[in-house]
Curated annotation (Swiss-Prot):
PANTHER family: UBIQUITIN CARBOXYL-TERMINAL HYDROLASE, UBIQUITIN CARBOXYL-TERMINAL HYDROLASE 3. GO terms for biological process: DNA repair; DNA repair-dependent chromatin remodeling; protein deubiquitination; proteolysis. Keywords: Acetylation, Cell cycle, Chromatin regulator, Cytoplasm, DNA damage, Hydrolase, Metal-binding, Nucleus, Protease, Thiol protease, Ubl conjugation pathway, Zinc, Zinc-finger. Zn(2+) 1 binds at C3, H5, C95, C98. It comes from Homo sapiens. It is found in: Nucleus; Cytoplasm. It comes from the Eukaryota. This is Ubiquitin carboxyl-terminal hydrolase 3. A zinc finger (UBP-type) spans 1-121.
Length: 520
């Protein structure tokens, strides 16, 4: 939408000396001194925290709108001020009076000039920080923010994601996907979306919400988020633009209540796939995939039509084999999948900790075996036998016909019992390297010795007792180091800590792909 309040609210000089010193993304709220989600008022240049922190930016606007009850309003007094502010991290502009993000500018282009000035300040601060880190590397090998890896000292550059109000489910999935190298690199190399019409023609889009409902691009906001996560210019990134697009195209996730991370991941991958099928930023899907010449036709597993990078990387194929127990008729069906949902076998569900000594520990192999074992269907799942011409008792078995490049395994920790959805808090042992999937293949003899091996890339963990509550974090490996992602906080961790986690979603990367022999 075009905001009608810019002319009266945007009064600040683009290069105003009133701006604080340092990096805009780390400016502190003038009230609570928090450096999370800073917003600058475009009327007076004061900095306040966003509504997801302590809401002082909104209170600044509200305090400025106290009506003049004892005086007749002049035309000047009637003008609305302090209504427009700019996010110091994403440079998106918001009007509290319109209660919406802003796409237009003043006649003199002041909004764009302020945006460019903030970018220059950010770049200058980043350059200064790089010089400082270089000096630290030269003068000292012991620094709290430096790590010794393979004999050389390197700086930690991982970026956290700010929690916008129970959005840890989204943050954990985004951090996990950002560490799937093939997947992440593909999106980061896509061209940026630009507006090509109206007053903002030729200008970069900073907030998808400004483009209107018909132009929101999940791919573009996902791309921008991935680019921000590993550039190292800030400690935490605010994914508000992506969150808004998620609200627009995935109504199930509207609001600020806790959501299921696995459900969000499936919706996200499905919608990325559908948007890429339709082409992106004027580049057809086929042209994008054609650039990645190492993707063979056999790897482009199709789900709902033509293949995209989503199905090329996460797509596998299951064979569902059903046998009638009365006449012996066999039915086979091939189903594509992006992830496998595994039950935790019932005999392990009372075992909550790895350190408990009563009975064997549940392993990921136990869950996979339960998924692929021959199963007799109960009375509520009778099979319609075409030979018997009626529903009959039957058995079912899954085989994996084709393994994906990235194997995503979801442990079904939430189950309905009566009217409640309870959590299975059992510890499940999982390997960091060398997960062998050969014994679950339909034709294992046709697979190579290395093609069935997988190494762990990321783990999503749910902390708490219920799907509608608790908290999500993620562990992921990047360049040989393991990180723990807890919203805006990123810390280095070790393999021993990772393997003790009660995994909810596991991302395994094909062994050859991770070794770098197969580049997307």
């Amino acid at each position: 939408m075009e905001c009608p309040h810019l002319s009266s609210s945007v009064c600040i000089a683009p290069d105003s000396a009133k701006f604080p010193n340092g990096s805009p993304s780390s400016w502190c709220c003038s009230v609570c001194r928090s450096n999370k989600s800073p917003w600058v008022c475009l009327t007076c240049s004061s900095v306040h925290c966003g509504r997801y922190v302590n809401g002082h930016a909104k209170k600044h606007y509200e305090d400025a709108q106290v009506p003049l009850t004892n005086h007749k309003k002049s035309e000047k007094q009637d003008k609305v001020q302090h209504t427009v502010c700019m996010d110091c991290s994403s440079y998106s502009t918001y009007c509290y009076r319109c209660d919406d993000f802003v796409v237009n500018d003043t006649k003199l282009g002041l909004v764009q000039k302020v945006r460019e000035h903030l970018q220059n300040l950010e770049n200058s601060a980043f350059t200064a920080d790089r010089h400082k880190k270089r000096k630290l590397l030269e003068n000292s090998t012991l620094n709290s923010k430096l790590l010794k890896v393979n004999g050389s000292t390197t700086a930690i550059c991982a970026t956290g994601l700010r929690n916008l109000g129970n959005t840890c489910f989204m943050n954990a999935i985004l951090q996990s996907l950002s560490n799937i190298e093939q997947f992440c690199c593909y999106f980061k190399e896509l061209p940026a979306v630009e507006l090509r019409n109206g007053k903002t023609a030729g200008r970069r889009t900073y907030h998808t919400r400004s483009q209107g409902d018909n132009n929101v691009s999940l791919v573009e906001e996902f791309r921008k988020t991935l680019c921000a996560l590993w550039q190292g210019s800030q400690t935490a990134f605010s994914p508000e633009s992506l969150f808004y697009v998620v609200w627009k195209i995935m109504p199930n996730f509207r609001g600020y209540q806790q959501q299921d991370a696995h459900e969000f991941m499936r919706y996200l991958l499905d919608h990325l796939h559908l948007e890429l099928q339709g082409g992106f930023n004027g580049v057809s899907r086929s042209a994008i995939l054609q650039e990645n010449s190492t993707l063979s036709a056999s790897n482009k597993c199709c789900i709902n039509g033509a293949s995209t990078v989503v199905t090329a990387i996460f797509g596998g194929i299951l064979q569902n084999e059903v046998n009638c127990l009365i006449c012996g008729t066999e039915s086979r069906k091939f189903d594509p999948f992006l992830d496998l949902s595994l039950d935790i076998p019932s005999q392990f569900r009372s075992k909550r900790s790895k350190n408990q000594e009563n009975g064997p520990v549940c392993s990921l192999r136990d869950c996979l075996r339960s998924f692929t074992d021959l199963e007799e269907l109960d009375e509520t799942e009778l099979y319609m036998c075409h030979k018997c011409k009626k529903k009959q008792k039957s058995t079912k078995k899954f085989w994996i016909q084709k393994l994906p490049k990235v194997l995503c395994l979801h442990l079904k920790r939430f189950h309905w019992t009566a009217y409640l959805r309870n959590k299975v808090d059992t510890y499940v042992e999982f390997p960091l390297r060398g997960l062998d999937m050969k014994c679950y293949l339909l034709e294992p003899e046709n697979s190579g010795p290395e093609s069935c091996l997988y190494d762990l890339a990321a783990v999503v963990v749910h902390h708490g007792s219920g799907v509608g509550s608790g908290h999500y974090t993620a562990y992921a490996t990047h360049e040989g180091r393991w990180f723990h992602f807890n919203d805006s906080t990123v810390t280095l961790t070790d393999e021993e800590t990772v393997v003790k986690a009660k995994a909810y979603i596991l991302f395994y990367v094909e062994h050859q792909a991770k070794a770098g022999s197969d580049k997307l």
